[in-house]
Amino acid sequence: MAAAAAGASGLMAPALAACSSGSGGAAPGSQGVLIGDRLYSGVLITLENCLLPDDKLRFTPSMSSGLDIDTETGLRVVGCELIQAAGILLRLPQVAMATGQVLFQRFFYTKSFVKHSMEHVSMACVHLASKIEEAPRRIRDVINVFHRLRHLREKKKPVPLVLDQEYVNLKNQIIKAERRVLKELGFCVHVKHPHKIIVMYLQVLECERNQHLVQTAWNYMNDSLRTDVFVRFQPESIACACIYLAARTLEIPLPNRPHWFLLFGATEEEIQEICFKILQLYTRKKVDLTHLESEVEKRKHAIEEAKARAKGLLPPGSAPGLDSATAGFSPAPKPESPKEGKGSKSSPLSVKNAKRKMEGPKKAKGDSPVNGLLKGQESRSQSRSREQSYSRSPSRSASPKRRKSDSGSTSGGSKSQSRSRSRSDSPPRQVHRGAPYKGSEVRGSRKSKDCKHLTQKPHKSRSRSSSRSRSRSRERTDSSGKYKKKSHYYRDQRRERSRSYERTGHRYERDHPGHSRHRR
């Protein structure tokens, strides 16, 4: 194919080039390349195909979305004013601001104001134009400037922009809008500005020394950026119209036989049309951006309702009135929300919470302190004493000190009594010290029974008191009997070990009589 870049669909007039037999991979005799529903035989990059045809001007995408011509024109004017004001605050050259406004006008002749945010596209055009004209600005600075302009337009005190998730989302939307602008314009973003052309034409007319005339023509040219003249006429015709209007305003005579603009290829009809469009700006009333945005929102909701009705989601007569302020442009309310329906069923979590509330007072009663100690603490002390008694190994009992204490006892019965006392449940400490030990022992036995029933873990006790043997059942007595047998078994083992230890001790004393003195 002839060139390497594609023009925007619908924006540029089709400029077709003949297909060569070997270039671009096209087969000989082929009619072109079908892209979408259009047939292209080539692409021609030229500034002449950046002008809109008449059919695009008469029926724009915004008009097809339901916006009237006045609202669309107001949005175009406000968007270009925002770009100009932001360029001044960003200290961009005038050429960059002009490029941004032209790109803005071109884009919204291919896309609708209803489907694309005017403010986001304005930011994207400023950011893109600054890079095109070799004066790049950071996207953060662009966002901050537009944020300040919005506050000033709404007559609010400017507040610094917060760097939160909303800022990140806005930044991503602007980047996407910039890509969309490039795609819709076919990456043909070059703009030929009439700034230099005005100075060159005034030099030909020998009026370049009249600074007032030059500045006035320049001002008219900057104001024409808010209109659609840059997508309808050549830059040479726009430059001639700005000079013509400035000379008529300042009452400076210019050659008219023949007319001077004919020398530069402009016609009288084009000059009059451009002057009429520029002067219309000064007779327009100041538009309110909030009113324009509300109109756009109305159209958005109307389109969404039409789509929902086409899909059968909304009945034909259930659409709310768009003019009612109280409706808020939301679809018809449902008789019962899904949250209310879910709330009627009891969830497992709510049942669990109710059980906890019921068990709360029972737990509090069970944890009431007895004799200054909680039941849990009492059971812990009992378990500790039992663990200590159980952990006494035969080796420990067979130590010399233990042997000495055992030999000091009078009878085996007294030995068993001392052992049973040491291994029985230790009574809890009394808060009232004057209480007798016997009553506290009875209370301790009762507490230990309660704890055993609560925890459902029966502990085998080695105490041989008559009160416990009466209260226990047959099964427990059997188990205690078994345990007693076991205890006798361990006791016999300890005795045998102690005897063997005594024998070895006597043997040791015979061999080494000096050491026996120290042991005694």
UniProtKB/Swiss-Prot annotation:
The keyword Transcription applies. It holds the Pfam family Cyclin_N. One of its GO terms (cellular component) is cyclin-dependent protein kinase holoenzyme complex. Residues 384-422 are annotated as: RS. The modification Phosphoserine is found at residues 330, 337, 347, 350, 368. CDD domains: CYCLIN_CCNL2_rpt1, CYCLIN_CCNL2_rpt2. Residues 309-520 are annotated as: Disordered. GO terms for molecular function: cyclin-dependent protein serine/threonine kinase regulator activity. Keywords: Cyclin, Nucleus, Phosphoprotein, Repeat, Transcription, Transcription regulation. It is found in: Nucleus speckle; Nucleus, Nucleoplasm. Residues 196-280 are annotated as: Cyclin-like 2. Interacts with CDK11A, CDK11B, CDK12, CDK13 and POLR2A, the hyperphosphorylated C-terminal domain (CTD) of RNA polymerase II. May form a ternary complex with CDK11B and casein kinase II (CKII). Interacts with pre-mRNA-splicing factors, including at least SRSF1, SRSF2 and SRSF7/SLU7. Involved in pre-mRNA splicing. May induce cell death, possibly by acting on the transcription and RNA processing of apoptosis-related factors. This is Cyclin-L2. The gene is Ccnl2.
